[in-house]
Regions:
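Membrane-interfacial helix-loop-helix connectors in multipass membrane proteins
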Residues: 144-167, 232-247
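Membrane-interface helix starts
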Residues: 12-27, 117-128, 206-217
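Hydrophobic alpha-helical transmembrane segments
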Residues: 22-23, 73-78, 123-125, 163-168, ...
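Alpha-helical transmembrane segments
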Residues: 72-87, 161-175, 249, 253
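Juxtamembrane transition segments at transmembrane-helix termini in multipass membrane proteins
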Residues: 6-8, 26-27, 31-32, 43-70, ...
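Alpha-helical membrane-spanning segments of integral membrane proteins, especially the hydrophobic core
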Residues: 72, 76, 107-135, 157-170
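Long, highly hydrophobic alpha-helical transmembrane signal-anchor segments
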Residues: 42-73, 134-162
Length: 284
């Protein structure tokens, strides 16, 4: 069986030979900005031209937002759906490209569009399903919130329950992150529906706990390291170093995102016997 270290090394070589794997993430970034336009439109609808903002007090601002609550709700809902749709299409596209690169050594933009169109709807529904599964953990916060006095005042029993709820929610979210780690990869690689992809991810984790945990920790460590570098640079007083924070963002889009997609795709394909060079048979 291919070790995680070998998987990371071979995945890196595949990414190095297919630098076009960053294209889905570039398109996703650009279109995600456009998807925020409904919120910008709601802002201008509520407050008018930017030059009028200096004359608006915080009380007036809150009153205007309350008066346009339906507009803001519709704008946030529309933007959320657009962002989810963009993410779903290009996540499927990126995984499709990664799978083709792992199988044949070369991925093309045609693979990107084909995978995105084929798996868009299932990926969109899977994103909503997994999102609700994570949000369901907020039930741990309800007892503490219910006991908080109105108006808000620190109350030991309520604060204790709230802190306990936050800890439980974090543990729940962490568990779900591991259990659902390969949902998009199972969905695209095995051409599954959203529910079957969730069950496949849970089953995959049961048989590959250590590998999933190690790769998850590696990806999180690299991501946090990159964010810490960007944060440290942004907090610096020397203005000449400010562009470096933008460089870390580009590294995330151009390098880290496609590279981790190759790693996760290779892990799923190798452990389910879909890579000819892995020597692994389907454990199920």
């Amino acid at each position: 069986m291919e070790e995680v270290g070998d998987l990371i090394g071979r995945g890196f070589r595949v990414w190095r030979n297919n630098l076009n794997l960053c294209l889905p993430f570039l398109f996703s970034f650009a279109l995600s900005i456009i998807a925020l336009l409904p919120i910008l439109a709601a802002f201008f609808y509520t407050f008018g031209p930017m030059e009028n903002l200096d004359s608006i007090t915080s009380e007036d601002m809150l009153a205007k937002i309350e008066g346009s609550a339906l507009v803001w709700a519709a704008a946030f809902l529309l933007s959320a759906l657009l962002l989810t749709g963009v993410s779903a299409f290009f996540t499927a596209a990126a995984i499709g490209m990664a799978g083709r690169a792992l199988e044949t050594g070369i991925a093309s933009t045609g693979d990107m569009w084909a995978a995105g169109k084929k798996h868009f709807l299932n990926m969109f529904l899977a994103s909503i399903l997994t999102g609700f599964m994570v949000i369901a953990g907020m039930v741990f916060l309800l007892p503490g919130i219910a006991l908080l006095p109105q108006p808000f005042q620190p109350e030991p029993q309520a604060m204790g329950l709230l802190i306990t709820g936050v800890v439980l929610f974090m543990l729940y979210a962490l568990s779900m992150s591991l259990l659902l780690a390969v949902v998009p990869y199972a969905l695209v690689t095995d051409d599954l529906g959203p529910v079957k992809a969730v069950w496949s991810s849970v089953g995959f984790f049961r048989y590959n706990k250590f590998d999933v945990l190690v790769l998850w920790l590696a990806v999180v460590a690299i991501s946090l390291g990159l964010q810490m570098i960007g944060g440290a640079v942004s907090a610096g007083e020397n203005v000449s170093f400010q562009p470096l924070s933008a460089v870390t963002g580009l590294v995330n889009v151009l390098v880290l995102s496609p590279l981790t997609t190759v790693w996760w795709t290779r892990l799923y394909m190798s452990r389910t016997g879909k890579l000819l060079d892995s020597g692994v048979k389907n454990p199920w």
